[in-house]
Amino acid sequence: MANFCLIFAAVFLTRLTTVLNTPISVTFGPTQLTDITKLVSETGDDFGLTTPRSAILTTVSEDDSDDDDGGESVEDTTILQTTTSSEIVISGIVVDEDIDESKVVKLKANLEQFGYVPLGSTFGEANINYTSAILEYQQNGGINQTGILDAETAALLDTPRCGVPDILPYVTGGIAWPRNVAVTYSFGTLSNDLSQTAIKNELRRAFQVWDDVSSLTFREVVDSSSVDIRIKFGSYEHGDGISFDGQGGVLAHAFLPRNGDAHFDDSERWTIGTNSGTNLFQVAAHEFGHSLGLYHSDVQSALMYPYYRGYNPNFNLDRDDIAGITSLYGRNTGSTTTTTRRPTITRTTTRRTTTRRTTTQLATTQTTTIRPPTYPTPPRQACTGSFDAVIKDNSDRIYALAGRYYWRLDQASPSWGVVRNRFGFDLPENVDASFQNGIFSYFFSGCYYYYQTSTRRRFPRTPFNRRWVGLPCDIDAVYKSGDSGTTYFFKGRFVYKFSSSNQLQRRSPISSYFRNTPYALRDGVEAVVRVDDVYLHFYRDGRYYRMIESTKQFVNFPNGLSYRDVIDTLIPQCRSLNLSVEIESCSNSSE
């Protein structure tokens, strides 16, 4: 009977694959997998399933006896994939049959070089989901997302591009040069394709692109011993351990602050103002974006898009580029030199000092005329407005956690307190992230999670890998989908998508997974919370960004809304405390 069911399922899937002309993924438990493998061996028919050709995409093992969602523990599962008649499978990668096998090797090299799979991966490794990696590669390249090596993907492999990875290892956010200090650069060995003067002028013009829209200023220096950005041309191995590949392919690469150096492949034919060769100005402006702290963009019209699109005589920065650079350095206020910006800071300090003296009286009046506090003044570290986690309970009360403390963000009855006193004495001092799922509240810290019911029944801490296999420690934020039961975890620049059965389905850069992602969120978020059935709020650096959950689209791009003001409004004591702190700092600076 079991064999009959398996045959029926296999034949049905094969027919459905033919009708839809698309691959289909199926999950079998270990017992069924043994049966179907035996069946294939006995009959000599693989029924269109790719497993006999080593196309196993993902194997997940989980033993979770504490499944509090009411579901059963997940068995060892193997995901199999059917293919259409026009596709073949090579080492775990589904390939259109008219694609040369050499492209498979090149695709794997690209996926490694640009951060989609670990370096040194072996073809067909069961723990590497090449389909997911290809989907991300296609999404960042702005082409159709099929998850297979098709003609469009093969063409993208041959497109000249920047050598900086699309997916960088985890780095802390906000990497940038200090504001109000000119960024210095120097010239090293230059190309012989053009005159030295012409090359330097184009490179200066590339810096000016970023100067025009931000508060940045640049200064050219001759001594390269202590310069911020060193510029040079070189071929193949050129001294930084990241070799160029000859003409075509990688055109240049650069390093993020506080290195910032930019290198250009001297094997390219660099040109100025012509469609032939490779336009020096456009490539340099892109690389200097990296030198200033920008990552790649999946917006095809953006300068920071990783692929070279040819000479554009009407070049302008895209809105996405401007949002990125101003999120790091602020907008150009009209000042053109570092020295003209410094007096602005002094004037601001003076004005704020005067204002603070006035509002100090208001804060004093507030404690006697508006609403007497029923709780003591919060400690200063609880008034920063920087949250570790945000959670909404079953009564629709929203709590923001900051270190040892929490805020209840409620216009009618705002309050604060110690996290352990409100949520449980067995919680750690610092919670990384949290979310609500039915009657359960989940809290994450380090490599462990804690959970309790709405009746305050608590469960012991549990390692991540008991429930979410593949989730890294020290996550930044988490939320659970309202309809599908999917859970999204955030760590650095990545979002980890887990199915309702807690299987890792995908790891993607935040910027490529959500639509219209604000630049401030591309290298990480502080917290996420569902505020109602429509919107999620993403918190970062004193601001929150609203996203429609059903479409995964941000709606107040690019600047967000301030939640520092929310704290000031809801918690009068915090506002009073912060004002007194600022008065003290202003008084000290004026002495």
UniProtKB/Swiss-Prot annotation:
Its cofactor is Zn(2+). Its EC number is 3.4.24.12. Zn(2+) binds at C162, H286, H290, H296. Residues 19-169 form a propeptide. Coiled coil: none annotated. Residues 333-379 are annotated as: Disordered. The active site is at E287. It comes from the Eukaryota. Glycans are attached at N129, N144, N578, N588. A motif (Cysteine switch) lies at residues 160-167. Transmembrane segments: none annotated. One of its GO terms (cellular component) is extracellular matrix. During hatching, the 50 kDa mature enzyme is autocatalytically cleaved to produce a major 38 kDa and a minor 15 kDa form which may be disulfide linked. Subsequent cleavage of the 38 kDa species yields a 32 kDa non-specific protease. Belongs to the peptidase M10A family. Allows the sea urchin to digest the protective envelope derived from the egg extracellular matrix; thus allowing the sea urchin to swim freely. This is 50 kDa hatching enzyme. It comes from Hemicentrotus pulcherrimus (Sea urchin). The lineage of its organism: Eukaryota, Metazoa, Echinodermata, Eleutherozoa, Echinozoa.
